[in-house]
Amino acid sequence: MADVSVLINGYGTIGKRVADAVDAQRDMEVLGVVKTSPDYLARLAVEEYGYPLFVPEDRVERFEDAGIETEGTVEDVVLNAEDYGLDVVVDCTPEGIGARNKETLYEKAGVKAIFQGGEEAEVAEVSFVAQCNYEEALGADYVRCVSCNTTALCRTLGTLKEEFELGRVYVTIVRRAADPHQVKKGPINAIAPNPVTVPSHHGPDVKTVMPDIDITTAAVKVPTTLMHMHVVRVELKEEVTSDDVIDAFEEARRIWVVPHGEGLGSTAELIELGRDLGRKRYDLYEILVWEESINVEDGVLYYMQAVHQEADVVPENVDAIRAMTELEEDPEASMDATDSALGVLNSPPL
């Protein structure tokens, strides 16, 4: 029997990946997943992956009518957590619903919960990126795994901050318009400020993890579904070469330095790399930095990185479970276990 039992509340883009990631670990298990709609994902969860399925009380009849087997209600499993052996809920519900679930379910039941980056930072005691502040989440009741963009920036900037003295950071975020399965979002023929205000919210979100970094961000949305891209400018307070930066990234966890010149010149080709590596759902958990973009000029570092928005936060959720339950106090040991189970690599197999 696994050491920790986990309920994934919300089985969509992130939730289904977190469920599979938890299921792959030796020291934790999936107690169940929660769905609100009796769709193909719910059917796959039960019939293909064998996950116990829980649903809201007011949706039970819909699942019965659809012929999808359920194990009970989400209200019952959370509010009777001890009876079910539930240790942690990973809340992967849409923005704002997690905070409501905390108030109506998790706090009432005294159950630990992890939230995603769409929630406000105030929902949790800690905003979390394993490489940056794992120890802060040890024993915490509520943790927020920050957004895909924030996670990516924390990984690369955190690596740089460990090695070099940094000044101001400026980032332009080029956001994908929607995930591949989403048909109700856009734009499909425009570039849109998102948000139109500068600075954007991404910089302050990075500071919830790395409070002493000086960062300003701006963001736009473009008509693509595959990945985000960041153009990063970092003022340096010491002499650093491009090779120093490449070495730092290559030594870091969950960051790949990839060669633009070997047919990896776009986000489409990076996603194809994920497919060719045999990754499930072509997931790229790692942040991919183009080697040729890394340049230091007049005391300023520039680089570009690509972010698979569906996947990069998944390892963080697993590490957060270990930290909160104190399964593992050493961040490196937790990340070793997570990465081994998921096939996360610290350098591309190129």
Swiss-Prot record:
Major location category of this protein: cytoplasm
Binding-site list for D-glyceraldehyde 3-phosphate: 147-149, 202-203
Protein name as catalogued: Glyceraldehyde-3-phosphate dehydrogenase
Record's subunit section: Homotetramer.
Active site: 148 (nucleophile)
Residues noted as binding NAD(+) in the record, renumbered to the chain: 13-14, 118, 176, 309
Domain of life of the native organism: Archaea
Similarity comment: family membership: Belongs to the glyceraldehyde-3-phosphate dehydrogenase family.
GO terms, biological process: glycolytic process
